[in-house]
């Protein structure tokens, strides 16, 4: 307890009458002035700061190639947060609230976010409500709120269980229950259209002219073409990986050049170029040498793969690890040429990293988020130099989203 030995703190006999009232008023005035002089030094200027008459909400600058969005799903909490970050300075620009295990998508021009949400009438129970919000990336205010059927895939935060069409006119989301399906949303009309029936396939990779691909259990891709009413045609591709070549949960896919990159648990990377005319599968790449495989180098994390299109470089998050630990964080990024598989460099992150992403400009940054540190770390993607970081990103930040162009 702190006490102040000041005359004004001593109890005084109560004055009476008019004179007493004047004396009391004088005492109160002198006490106030004296107490002002006795303000503890440790309180600093805050206690005497003038209150603002008006408050305002700042508007973020227009999105650019180094705008970063970090999703904190809070380890299956009922609410999530999307942090908007200036990737050049690691400055926080804004936050957006979301529901349980949301899908976050960035428009090709960076002007809006699309967030597929799930909420319940009694927080963690009660009537389920699935909906889609479009968020202006400057004001962080909703520009559309679209009701969708309750059936969104809720097993984790996967990057490709929902996606914007390549022209940003439609949004596709995966339905898990009561049967496999893909929901179609018309973003121009701001309206849900239809659940399109699909076989037991997963992940959504959009291409031009209202086409998309999904990965099926037999190791093939299925191509779908849809019209404005949600009527579909489908055709399978060849099987491109064996049953025991297990693929990691989050592949990299570019809506702008339709390049699919998908690593296995052991560091083999399958690639394909997708288009309206079909899928062109490229020669797989082995990231690790035989010696590195013997030394137990394997990919690990949540978003483990990134791709810089202009430099034709693949970035794989990896570490020395036992089998079946592929969801645990890693401390290194291996960079290889996407065509030849030639090792270009290895970047030591010096942190337990869950997810990575790479900006698509001519001076790319490597972004790495850590659930443990609740921090987004930024590196020069070419020389690996640590540049900056921003911490206190919620409870368990685990995913990174950037504009594709």
From Swiss-Prot:
Sorted alphabetically, the Gene Ontology BP terms of this entry are: methylamine metabolic process
**Could you say which EC number(s) this protein's record lists?**
1.4.9.1
- Signal peptide span: 1-36
Where does this polypeptide localize? Periplasm
Where does the UniProt entry say this protein principally localizes?
A: periplasm
Name listed for the protein in its UniProt record = Methylamine dehydrogenase heavy chain
One function term, GO molecular function aspect = methylamine dehydrogenase (amicyanin) activity
Q: Which keywords belong to this entry?
A: Electron transport, Oxidoreductase, Periplasm, Signal, Transport
Quaternary data: Tetramer of two light and two heavy chains.
């Amino acid at each position: 307890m702190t006490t102040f030995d000041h005359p004004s703190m001593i109890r005084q006999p109560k004055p009476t009458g008019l004179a007493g009232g004047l004396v009391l008023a004088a005492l109160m005035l002198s006490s106030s002035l004296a107490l002002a002089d006795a303000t503890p030094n440790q309180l600093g200027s805050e206690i005497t700061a003038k209150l603002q008459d008006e408050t305002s909400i700042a508007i973020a600058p227009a999105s650019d190639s180094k705008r970063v969005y970090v999703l904190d799903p809070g380890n299956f909490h009922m609410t999530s947060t999307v942090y908007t970050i200036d990737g050049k300075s690691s400055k926080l620009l804004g936050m957006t609230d979301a529901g349980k295990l949301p899908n976050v998508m960035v428009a090709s021009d960076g002007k809006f976010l699309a967030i597929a949400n799930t909420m319940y009438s009694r927080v963690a129970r009660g009537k389920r409500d699935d909906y889609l919000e479009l968020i202006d990336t400057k004001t962080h205010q909703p520009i559309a709120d679209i009701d969708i059927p309750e059936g969104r895939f809720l097993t984790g935060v996967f990057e490709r269980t929902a996606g914007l069409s390549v022209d940003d006119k439609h949004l596709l989301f995966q339905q898990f229950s009561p049967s496999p399906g893909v929901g179609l949303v018309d973003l121009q009309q701001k309206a849900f259209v239809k659940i399109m029936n699909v076989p037991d396939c997963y992940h959504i990779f959009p291409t031009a002219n209202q086409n998309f691909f999904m990965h099926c259990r037999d190791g093939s891709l299925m191509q779908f073409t849809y019209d404005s009413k949600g009527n579909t045609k489908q055709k399978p591709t060849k099987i491109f990986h064996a049953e025991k070549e297990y693929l990691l949960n989050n592949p990299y896919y570019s809506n702008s050049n339709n390049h699919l990159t998908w690593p296995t648990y052991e560091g083999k990377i399958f690639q394909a170029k997708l288009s309206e005319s079909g899928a062109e599968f490229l020669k797989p790449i082995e990231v690790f040498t035989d010696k590195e495989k013997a030394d137990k180098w394997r990919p690990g994390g949540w978003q483990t793969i990134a791709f810089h299109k202009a430099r034709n470089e693949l970035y794989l998050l990896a570490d020395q690890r036992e089998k079946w630990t592929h969801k645990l964080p890693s401390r290194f990024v291996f960079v290889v040429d996407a065509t030849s598989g030639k090792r270009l460099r290895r970047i030591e992150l010096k942190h337990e990293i869950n997810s990575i992403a790479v900006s698509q400009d001519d001076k790319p940054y490597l972004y790495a988020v850590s659930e443990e540190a609740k921090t987004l770390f930024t590196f020069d993607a070419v020389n690996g130099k640590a540049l900056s970081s921003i911490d206190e990103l919620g409870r368990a930040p685990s995913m990174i989203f950037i504009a594709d162009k």
